[in-house]
Design a protein with these regions (language model features):
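Solvent-exposed soluble domains appended to multi-pass membrane proteins
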Residues: 77-479
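N-terminal secretory/membrane-targeting segments
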Residues: 1-96, 113, 119-126, 133, ...
Length: 479
């Protein structure tokens, strides 16, 4: 009996060790290691990936779809992820610093600036960001390309979408990649990422490394230098937004210009906890997330108060964009698929060089090409988005995968495509999607454009190539 008891205990211990080894640890917040984690240690990630690990992590990943809606020549005429910047630019902010705030669960519905009718007698939950929008360049029709945080980083930093599966989880993500941080690094920028969680809890560090970010500041870096107590550390995720943003401000002060800083906040994520010294000071909210959104907004205000007198501040482009819409929903229109993607997105420059309201459809994929255009970047680059200021020839359509179909959002129409045909279409102002316009002539044009994007996407996945190839540059030079 003793023999079997001992061996049973040994068996259980071995199983637990194997489980922890495959996950990469035992912490609740930790995501199991994936192929992209290799990018943290070398740019040649294939050199350190073992065959058994690759086999284990790719079982069930499925093969890449073969979409052949168009010939190669037809496809190139409709859509290409290869961008060749023009000589004439609407703005030239070359050499400016970049500070990019990726805002957790910042649905469009939280803002009174975006929704004055939703909050006729309230201030909304983002009063400080609303004040910046009043002086900034606001995209009033902006959309996320996914429903989860893990899908946001590839869309924003490398302009690559996720559809049926998060791009970062695909083995094909380990291809030739040149993200926005990589391009800026080649221009002499330092690149840093700030997120108050533990490293790799959401593959953030792994994908940030793939995208070209050199320096990663997380919970450990904060705890090594700053106060640790119940008002600074949230027990599940990591550092509360306010102390972490102030820590980020201090670190930025130490950087040489030009720099590119990306931050990803935590407090507006489930389980929606607030530090005790602010728990009773935030507005109650209509949903669980809104008091936390108000706290995150206040945290950004404190960051600006601390940084606004620093020498680097006036020479900086600030970008604010949500990672996705919160599952906590208040506005009726947010319940419908188009509204489930409607997010914050605006630019702010202290010298007011960028101001206005832009009603055209924009998406997370547009961040990288738009910023490259603002910085005067003149070399070819790879992107599934568009430079909203300098590429009027590219059609504007925000894409996503929701409810097992592809969604295409344009200025006047939203379509739903099952991979073979459009199954429904609705006018943009039909927010509750009651009147199906399936036979509308404009649907055919949108279907064609969406098919071209999807065919190009799956082709690039199969090639594992997310850069502009030399032959495309040669073809362009001959035109």
């Amino acid at each position: 009996m003793h023999y079997y008891s001992v061996h049973s205990v040994i068996f259980i211990v071995v199983i637990l060790v194997l489980f922890g080894g495959m996950r990469g640890g035992f912490k609740l917040k930790l995501r199991p290691y994936n192929l992209c984690n290799a990018a943290q240690y070398t740019q040649q990630s294939y050199l350190i990936l073992s065959n058994p690990f690759c086999l284990f992590r790719t079982i069930g990943a499925g093969s890449i779809e073969e979409l052949n809606y168009f010939s190669e020549m037809e496809l190139e005429e409709i859509f290409s992820p290869y961008h060749f910047p023009s000589d004439s630019l609407r703005y030239n902010l070359e050499g400016r610093n970049i500070v990019l705030f990726i805002l957790e669960s910042f649905s469009k519905e939280h803002s009174k600036f975006y929704n004055p009718d939703l909050y006729p007698a309230e201030d909304g939950y983002t009063p400080f960001l609303d004040s910046l929008m009043a002086e900034g360049y606001v995209f009033t029709n902006a959309y996320a390309n996914g429903l989860r945080s893990i899908e946001a980083l590839p869309s924003i930093l490398t302009s690559i979408p996720s559809y049926k599966a998060p791009f970062v989880m695909l083995p094909q993500s380990l291809g030739n990649l040149e993200g926005f941080p990589t391009i800026l690094k080649n221009l002499g920028y330092s690149t840093s990422f700030f997120c108050g969680t533990e490293k790799n809890s959401m593959f953030f560090e792994a994908y940030a490394s793939m995208a070209g970010i050199e320096n990663f500041y997380a919970k450990d870096e904060y705890m090594a230098e700053c106060a640790v107590n119940e008002n600074t550390i949230e027990p599940f995720w990591g550092v509360y937004d306010m102390p972490f943003f102030l820590f980020m401000a201090d670190k930025i002060d130490e950087m040489e210009e030009p720099f590119c800083v990306t931050s990803f906040n935590l407090t507006s994520h489930h389980p929606f906890r607030l530090p005790s010294d602010y728990a009773d000071k935030m507005p109650q909210g209509h949903t669980l997330v809104q008091p936390c959104v108000a706290y995150s907004d206040l945290s950004i205000r404190k960051f600006f108060e601390k940084s606004s007198q620093k020498p680097w501040f006036k020479n900086t482009i600030f970008i604010f964009i949500a990672d996705h819409v919160s599952p906590e929903i208040y506005a009726p229109q947010t319940c419908y698929p188009r509204g489930r993607m409607a997010i914050f997105y605006f630019l702010y420059t202290p010298d007011k060089v960028l101001q206005g309201l832009d009603p055209q459809v924009t998406q997370q994929l547009d961040v990288m090409p738009t910023l490259l255009g603002l910085l005067g970047y003149d070399k070819p680059y790879f992107s599934f988005g568009r430079d909203v200021f300098n590429e009027p020839e590219r059609f504007s359509i925000a894409t996503s995968y929701i409810n097992e179909v592809y969604q295409g959002i344009a200025d006047s129409l939203t379509i739903y495509f099952d991979g073979e045909k459009v199954i429904s279409a609705f006018a943009a102002d039909d927010i509750f999607q009651k009147n199906n316009l399936l036979n509308n002539r404009e649907v055919n044009v949108m279907e064609r454009n969406l098919k071209a994007i999807l065919q190009s996407y799956y082709q690039q996945l199969k090639k594992q190539q997310y850069i502009v190839p030399h032959d495309a540059v040669d073809r362009m030079s001959k035109k």
